Amino acid sequence: TEDDIKNEYRKIFLTKNSVESILEVQHSNDGNYDTGNGHKLDRDAAAPHFTGTIAAYTPTQNHVDEYGMREGYTYDKNNPYVGRDYRFYANVLYDGSEYNGHKMDIHYTRTGNTEVAGEDLTQYGESETASYTRTGYYMGKFVDETQKIDKDETYASKQNYIIWRYAEALLDYAEVMFRLGEENTALA
């Protein structure tokens, strides 16, 4: 199913020392702020619905547009998120997407002269630095939705950061072969 594909892809970036990984920055933190060796990605990138986050990293429309349509699908401006490349669903949280049991509400509703922000366009938590998306999207890639975030100073994120993946090495090799005029090798 689409959810299975999305979840398998997301696991590549959340599983320590995955078979897909060639080089990773290791984080030995057990998810507890006090033990150190963690990082703040979950706090800095997660949608504000998850309390204590600041939504500092959000995908832009240009980034979203890079995800093409799957074979057999055409772009529909009334349903722009249907039929996208599977990686889109793992990497980008958009209005109506499911994340950690929560349906993302990232839109404005106008009633007469009143404009009401969706739940995920509202600042949450105690954070003075809390923010919300300015692009209409939140980051899904690399973010561990099971990570509990409860304070601004948290360095409790524990997932490793993949610098180089096996799939990237294969694509790099194919590109080099193509540029050297070895098109058959590149396509093999």
Enumerate the predicted regions with their spans.
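Extended, hydrophobic/aromatic-rich amphipathic alpha-helical segments that build helical scaffolds
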Residues: 1, 23, 88-93, 160-188
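An aromatic- and glycine-enriched ligand-binding surface/loop that stacks and positions planar moieties
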Residues: 1-122
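Extracellular/surface-associated beta-sandwich interaction domains
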Residues: 62, 66-68, 142-143, 156, ...
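Active-site beta-strand/loop architecture of penicillin-binding DD-peptidases
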Residues: 119-165
